[in-house]
């Protein structure tokens, strides 16, 4: 009697890893890094195994539930990886400087914002099914920073698998919209030669001004866990004298255990922070994360009393030199979300990007989505009407910078 052939299920090649022992498998880690090295994703730093371990450890708080979705091809080789953690996302109802209310949603966070694998709809639909199953207790799946022109964004908007189970929503978040970055050449000399003459001369002049003022600039790099306490002490001192402090913005919020957080990053080779000293005095700081050939500039600040010396510009310029001066020069630098003059000064590329939320199709989520979208439309329309009909004396006044945005005159 002939046996009936077994039909292989669609997700036969998919495996959801949830144990630390499986995460640490040497063969998986090697293949993980191979896939990362071929990825064009600017946020591949946050797809790395090192960042995944840092994210799930959640230093200073409770560890997060985590998983790695792995897909194997016909030959058994891993051809797609999706690292995930469960955390809380939020939809905030923001009008100008005021946050009226914030709804928190349990979410499966896709680290690096994109699936790491072949870019085709069937493949992504298959991976989504595995993510959906693991995140069945979550209200949504979050892609924190998706380029508008990426395959991931087009798939999220058009996939039938997404439309059947989720509401795709890209909420407007104040301070987002564009990401600025720099694609590095092989050396710092090549970077300088690629600048237009005006910018090149301007950078070098600002460095010389420090020498002429008797305050020569010195860049200090911090990489090890043992250096974290000193970095935090010096950086917090600078932050207290920064323009951000004047508007109530703290780059090191007290509800975060920065000692634990940065020390854990350092132990995983992710921590790369800087202090600029001018004549021996702390003048500016830069907070960064480095992995997979990319440096992410996550926060910066300078002592406002030294603004005439352009410490922020000098700091960033010297950081570029350091990133390109080592035995393994980095390939890219990301300044993240936000359109500010200093980013335009240093970056050679920008692109539109958004946070994308895949909200489960539930009555509560649909009500929240419709309410938030309608509120955002109302706020946008009100702003347009105000700008059109505001009194003439208001038009003559320059608007104050948004929180997190350095004044144009600061550098």
Enumerate the predicted regions with their spans.
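Short secondary-structure junction motifs
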Residues: 138, 214-216, 271, 330, ...
């Amino acid at each position: 009697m002939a046996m009936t052939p077994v039909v292989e299920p669609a997700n036969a090649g998919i495996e959801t890893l949830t144990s630390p022992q499986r995460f640490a498998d040497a063969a998986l880690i090697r293949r993980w890094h191979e896939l990362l090295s071929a990825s064009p994703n600017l946020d591949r730093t946050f797809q790395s195994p090192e960042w995944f371990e840092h994210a799930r450890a959640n230093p200073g708080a409770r560890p997060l539930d985590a998983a790695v979705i792995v897909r194997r091809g016909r030959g058994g080789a891993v051809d797609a990886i999706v690292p995930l953690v469960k955390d809380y996302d939020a939809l905030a109802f923001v009008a100008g400087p005021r946050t009226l209310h914030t709804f928190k949603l349990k979410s499966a966070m896709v680290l690096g914002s994109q699936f790491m694998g072949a870019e085709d709809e069937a493949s992504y639909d298959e991976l989504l099914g595995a993510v959906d199953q693991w995140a069945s207790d979550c209200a949504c799946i979050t892609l924190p920073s998706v380029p508008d022109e990426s395959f991931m964004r087009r798939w999220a908007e058009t996939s039938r698998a997404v439309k059947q189970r989720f509401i795709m929503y890209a909420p407007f978040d104040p301070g987002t919209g564009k990401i600025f970055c720099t694609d590095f050449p092989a050396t710092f000399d090549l970077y300088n030669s690629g600048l237009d003459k005006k910018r090149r001369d301007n950078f070098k002049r600002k460095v010389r001004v420090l020498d002429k003022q008797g305050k020569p600039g010195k860049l200090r790099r911090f990489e090890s866990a043992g250096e974290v306490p000193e970095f935090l002490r010096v950086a917090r001192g600078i932050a207290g004298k920064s323009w951000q402090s004047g508007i109530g913005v703290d780059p090191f919020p007290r509800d975060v255990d920065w000692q634990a957080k940065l020390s854990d990053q350092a132990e995983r080779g992710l921590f790369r922070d800087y202090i600029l000293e001018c004549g021996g005095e702390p003048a500016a700081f830069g907070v960064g994360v480095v992995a997979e050939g990319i440096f992410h500039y996550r926060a910066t600040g300078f002592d406002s009393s030294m603004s005439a010396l352009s410490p922020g510009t000098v700091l960033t310029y010297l950081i570029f030199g350091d990133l390109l001066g080592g035995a393994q020069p980095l390939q890219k630098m990301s300044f993240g979300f936000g359109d500010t003059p200093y980013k335009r000064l240093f970056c050679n590329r920008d692109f539109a990007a958004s946070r994308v939320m895949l909200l489960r199709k539930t009555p509560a989520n649909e009500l929240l989505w419709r309410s938030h979208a309608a509120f955002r439309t109302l706020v946008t329309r009100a702003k347009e009407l105000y700008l059109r009909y505001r009194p003439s004396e208001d038009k003559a006044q320059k608007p104050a910078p948004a929180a997190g945005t350095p004044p144009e005159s600061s550098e």
